[in-house]
């Protein structure tokens, strides 16, 4: 399991420009991530997803996020997320630890 505080810093640097995590948070360029764990791809209410995201059919969890965050466009070809990914496994683990906490508060 990663470090929540390090993960928060990564989120602020790399994700917060496009995503919010708090309950009732607004969608930005990307969807609000509250309730992410256990949710299927392309299911945040009120966000306009690509068919690629809607049709991927996986459920977000630690393993799926670990793979997705390494290279989003490879994992879901056709996603509109314009983020190259996080190559370092430790950084992805930290970010996932933060997301697991922050999207469930």
UniProtKB/Swiss-Prot annotation:
Positions of post-translational N6-succinyllysine modification: 56, 73
Q: For binding heme c, which residues are annotated in this chain's numbering?
A: 15, 18-19, 81
Q: Which UniProt keywords apply?
A: Acetylation, Apoptosis, Electron transport, Heme, Iron, Metal-binding, Mitochondrion, Phosphoprotein, Respiratory chain, Transport
This entry carries the following GO cellular component terms, namely: mitochondrial intermembrane space
Q: How is it modified after translation?
A: Binds 1 heme c group covalently per subunit. Phosphorylation at Tyr-49 and Tyr-98 both reduce by half the turnover in the reaction with cytochrome c oxidase, down-regulating mitochondrial respiration.
Residues recorded with modification N6-acetyllysine = 73, 100
Q: Quick one: where is this thing mainly located?
A: mitochondrion
Modified positions (N-acetylglycine) are: 2
Question: Which residues are modified to Phosphotyrosine?
Answer: 49, 98
Give the family this protein belongs to, as stated in its UniProt record. Answer: Belongs to the cytochrome c family.
Task: Report the protein's function.
Answer: Electron carrier protein. The oxidized form of the cytochrome c heme group can accept an electron from the heme group of the cytochrome c1 subunit of cytochrome reductase. Cytochrome c then transfers this electron to the cytochrome oxidase complex, the final protein carrier in the mitochondrial electron-transport chain. Plays a role in apoptosis. Suppression of the anti-apoptotic members or activation of the pro-apoptotic members of the Bcl-2 family leads to altered mitochondrial membrane permeability resulting in release of cytochrome c into the cytosol. Binding of cytochrome c to Apaf-1 triggers the activation of caspase-9, which then accelerates apoptosis by activating other caspases.
Question: What protein name is recorded for this chain?
Answer: Cytochrome c
Q: Which organism is this entry from?
A: Lama guanicoe
């Amino acid at each position: 399991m990663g470090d929540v505080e390090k993960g928060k810093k990564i989120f602020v640097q790399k994700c917060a420009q496009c995503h919010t995590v708090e309950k009732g948070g607004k969608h930005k360029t990307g969807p609000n991530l509250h309730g992410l764990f256990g949710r299927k791809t392309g299911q945040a209410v009120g966000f306009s997803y690509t068919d690629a995201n809607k049709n991927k059919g996986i459920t977000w969890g630690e393993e799926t996020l670990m793979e997705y965050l390494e290279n989003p466009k490879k994992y879901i070809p056709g996603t509109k997320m314009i983020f190259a990914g996080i190559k370092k496994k430790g950084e992805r683990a930290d970010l996932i630890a933060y997301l697991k906490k922050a999207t469930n508060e």
